[in-house]
A protein has these predicted regions:
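Bacterial N-terminal signal peptides
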Residues: 17-29
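Active-site-adjacent mobile loop/cap segments within catalytic or ligand-binding domains
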Residues: 52, 171-273
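Pro/Ala/Gly-rich low-complexity, hydrophilic intrinsically disordered segments
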Residues: 256-329
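Catalytic-core regions of hydrolytic enzymes
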Residues: 34-165, 180-184, 188-192, 248, ...
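Short linear Ser/Thr-Pro motifs
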Residues: 4-6, 113, 233
């Protein structure tokens, strides 16, 4: 009886000790995470004298900015613990390395670059895709990176700024084969969340998660993605992305994916989260008209492969953060 009693008391003491330890340690972990704002940098691609891709009725730079501002406004309105920083908030030209520099100087938790896709020679395609840093696995992926990186040609000193990088030369992209990104796993996961929302919330064709050598992602020292909202070269998609409904719905999809990522991030660090992801019924905006199912493909195996590669790659050397102060237009 004495043995059983002492063992019972021992269990009580153990529980009390564990509770005390939790009270001492857990709140401090939670408060340390919530002591500072979660910082997200939203990058509207192109701008100013760089129009980006040009469609029949619009320019890419304006679509990108419109959606970027809508995403930022959704976050500001609903997340008082998030600091939103834009690389540009109006029609100005911002050098490619400066965009990443803004994010690095702000010690951002996420970098989201928003773009609009295009195909040459009057070819058409539909759907949204999300990209992470890596070696392009196909000629088509390489062409997307070349097009986005070619904006450095608007900079007079681009050869010096980007160490001789030629955005139109396949040889310049060999560097991405040997480069490792310690944020790859988080970036691929965020990209997967984006694609899920583009398909489920926005009702757009899911073109999947891809990798390519984007300079703006290479220079950012945090989980980073580049979104292609749709194809400005496809008249139907161009009209959709220029409509209030289309831009608003795409922004809502990006916002919901951001909330899901933030919630998972908090749960992983502290076991608790203040972030609430609203259900479809709780939101005012109605989904956009669904695209044909034939436009969608099963991209789950591809995304799982990228995640597996991210987990098996060794941690990379941290990317260097530029030292100039933040000056946001």
């Amino acid at each position: 009886r004495d043995f059983c009693l002492s063992r019972g008391l021992g269990d009580v003491y153990k529980r009390q000790i564990l509770i005390c330890l939790w009270l001492l340690v857990s709140p401090s972990n939670v408060s340390s995470v919530w002591a500072k704002d979660f910082v997200v940098v939203i990058d509207a691609g192109h701008g100013g004298h760089d129009p980006g891709a040009i469609g029949k009725i619009s320019k890419e730079k304006n679509i990108n900015l419109n959606v970027a501002l809508k995403v930022g406004n959704l976050i500001k309105r609903n997340c008082d613990d998030v600091k939103v920083i834009y690389t540009r908030s109006k029609d100005v030209f911002t050098p490619l390395d400066r965009r990443a520099e803004i994010a690095n100087n702000a010690k951002a938790d996420l970098f989201i670059s928003i773009h609009t896709n295009a195909l040459a020679n009057n070819r058409t395609a539909k759907g949204a895709s999300t990209w992470t840093l890596g070696l392009a696995k196909s000629d088509a992926n390489l062409e997307v990176a070349k097009r986005e990186n070619s904006v450095i040609l608007y900079e007079s000193d681009y050869k010096t700024r980007y160490a001789g990088f030629n955005p139109n030369s396949a040889e310049s992209y060999i560097i991405f084969e040997f480069m490792q990104d310690k944020y790859m796993e988080q970036s691929v996961h965020l990209a997967s969340l984006m694609q899920k929302q583009f398909h489920q919330t926005c009702k757009r064709a899911d073109r999947g998660v891809h990798q390519a050598g984007f300079l703006v992602l290479k220079a950012s020292a945090m989980p980073s993605i580049l979104i292609e909202l749709g194809f400005i070269s496809t008249p139907e998609e161009e009209r959709y992305l220029n409509s209030e409904e289309g831009a608003g719905t795409m922004a809502k999809g990006i916002y919901r994916a951001f909330l899901n990522y933030k919630r998972e991030h908090e749960l992983r660090l502290t076991g608790v989260s203040k972030t609430i992801v609203p259900t479809e019924q709780e939101e005012d905006n109605t989904p956009a008209t669904a695209q044909k199912d034939t436009e969608s493909v099963n991209t789950a195996p591809q995304q799982e492969k990228l995640l597996a590669e991210a987990k098996t790659k060794p941690a990379a050397t941290a990317k260097t953060a530029p030292k100039r102060p933040i000056v946001v237009e």
